[in-house]
């Protein structure tokens, strides 16, 4: 069996097109365009690239985009004051603080300061709590994007054994909640898990988000399973690889996401989708 590719790039492009169309309709109806504020602290090269992509995405769909590029020594109090101002700004529907932050800043405190209805990353405890209570409002972007990718395969998730490799607050934990909502029986593995191979080999669906290249061996993948690889790791030769041993896994899986071009584009598209949702359903 050779797996079919889940083309995140194409699915994300289609989603951006739909969002741009809706923004055009809003303009024609005399409604304001959605607004996204992006806060970048310091000069981390990867963060600068991510933020540049997000601004380009906003431009493409016609959003108002406000950029706050702040020096690395910016204080916690100054950042909190900026977030407060953006919370009160009626032109802004979403506030994004680019992670990671410099060591002297408390990311949890800053993310919790964002009003839940402007938390378009979906990281606020209120939004995670709503997802856990089966009443999602603004959903974490990567898990939300993965659910869209899974829907594109036409696979029926009800009753599937799903394994999430990695238990981060950004992907693993909310991913487990999304899969529960989708009708899966979910196992979350983490650094204390014994015999990872055994868990993975029994899974109908594997979502890997550990940040370790080649952690999940291709031979562990059950024949016909769906494989979603969230990992993006740069090798010494400059190549980008995922957390799954792709070549072998692709011979066993029914569907698999490539790296790059799988999950990453959907995360960005879902940030736009959340911002549009906030504008239309939470702020208009």
Swiss-Prot record:
Keywords: Amino-acid biosynthesis, Histidine biosynthesis, Hydrolase, Methionine biosynthesis, Multifunctional enzyme, NADP, One-carbon metabolism, Oxidoreductase, Purine biosynthesis. CDD domains: NAD_bind_m-THF_DH_Cyclohyd. It holds the Pfam family THF_DHG_CYH_C. GO terms for biological process: L-histidine biosynthetic process; methionine biosynthetic process; purine nucleotide biosynthetic process; tetrahydrofolate interconversion. Catalyzes the oxidation of 5,10-methylenetetrahydrofolate to 5,10-methenyltetrahydrofolate and then the hydrolysis of 5,10-methenyltetrahydrofolate to 10-formyltetrahydrofolate. Belongs to the tetrahydrofolate dehydrogenase/cyclohydrolase family. This is Bifunctional protein FolD. It comes from Pseudomonas aeruginosa (strain ATCC 15692 / DSM 22644 / CIP 104116 / JCM 14847 / LMG 12228 / 1C / PRS 101 / PAO1). The lineage of its organism: Bacteria, Pseudomonadati, Pseudomonadota, Gammaproteobacteria, Pseudomonadales. The gene is folD.
């Amino acid at each position: 069996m050779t797996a079919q590719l889940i083309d995140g790039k194409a699915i994300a492009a289609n989603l951006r097109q739909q969002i741009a169309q809706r923004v055009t309709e809003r303009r024609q109806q005399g409604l304001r365009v959605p607004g996204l504020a992006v806060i970048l602290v310091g000069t981390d090269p990867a963060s600068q690239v991510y933020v540049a992509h997000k601004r380009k995405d906003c431009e493409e769909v016609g959003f108002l985009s406000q950029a706050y590029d702040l020096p690395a020594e910016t204080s916690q109090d100054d950042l909190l004051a900026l977030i407060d101002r953006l919370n009160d700004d009626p032109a802004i529907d979403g506030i994004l603080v680019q992670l990671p932050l410099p060591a002297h800043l408390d990311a949890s405190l800053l993310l919790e300061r964002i009003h839940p209805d402007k938390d378009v990353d979906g990281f606020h405890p209120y939004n995670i709590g709503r997802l856990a209570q089966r009443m999602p409002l603004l959903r974490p972007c990567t898990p939300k994007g993965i659910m869209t990718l899974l829907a594109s395969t036409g696979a029926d998730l009800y009753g599937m054994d799903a394994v999430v490799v990695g238990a981060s607050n950004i992907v693993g934990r909310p991913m487990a909640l999304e899969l529960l909502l989708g009708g899966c029986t979910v196992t979350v593995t983490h650094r204390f898990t014994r015999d990872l191979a055994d868990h993975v080999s029994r899974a109908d669906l594997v979502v890997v988000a550990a940040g370790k290249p080649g952690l999940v061996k291709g031979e562990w993948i059950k024949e016909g399973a769906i494989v979603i690889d969230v990992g993006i790791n740069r090798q010494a030769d400059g190549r980008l690889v995922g957390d799954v041993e792709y070549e072998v896994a692709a011979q066993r899986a029914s569907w698999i996401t490539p790296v790059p071009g799988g999950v990453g584009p959907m995360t960005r598209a879902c940030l736009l989708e959340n911002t549009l949702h906030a504008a239309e359903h939470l702020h208009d």
